[in-house]
């Protein structure tokens, strides 16, 4: 059953499905594993942290207090095309978790974030 509303439970499910895809991806997996680690415990912490980020973005709640853009700026350079892969995997995950209306709400936000990060990384960040 797909979620018809965005809530903490649905965001947690999204994080589980999405990051399982990321970890297995031939392009994104190595970048994320190098930055986060390879243990399930390290990934559990990351999923909770990013879940809090999305809860803040989508629900106005959560206790995220990181600097996601800085984290990306600190990564070794990677091809800009990897953002397309990230968005594809994110949309696939949204399709599993949410109905069409909620998927589109979250996807629009994800596309805006990806666009902003790309501008900052590739126009101004030296990637």
Swiss-Prot record:
Listed Pfam families: Bac_globin (PF01152)
Disruption phenotype: Cells lacking this gene grow less well than wild-type under conditions of high aeration.
GO-annotated cellular components: cytoplasm
Alphabetical UniProt keywords: Cytoplasm, Heme, Iron, Metal-binding, Transport
Gene3D superfamilies on file: Globins
Domain of life: Bacteria
Cofactor note: Binds 1 heme group per subunit; upon expression in E.coli it purifies predominantly in the Fe(2+)-oxy form, binding O(2) tightly even under anaerobic conditions.
Protein function: Has been suggested to be involved in cytochrome c peroxidase or P450-like oxygen chemistry or cyanide detoxification. The high oxygen affinity of this protein suggests that it probably does not function as an oxygen transporter.
Annotated protein name in UniProt: Group 3 truncated hemoglobin ctb
Inducing stimuli: Constitutively expressed, it is further induced by S-nitrosoglutathione (GSNO) and S-nitroso-N-acetylpenicillamine (SNAP) (at protein level).
InterPro entries: Globin-like_sf, Globin/Proto, Hemoglobin_trunc
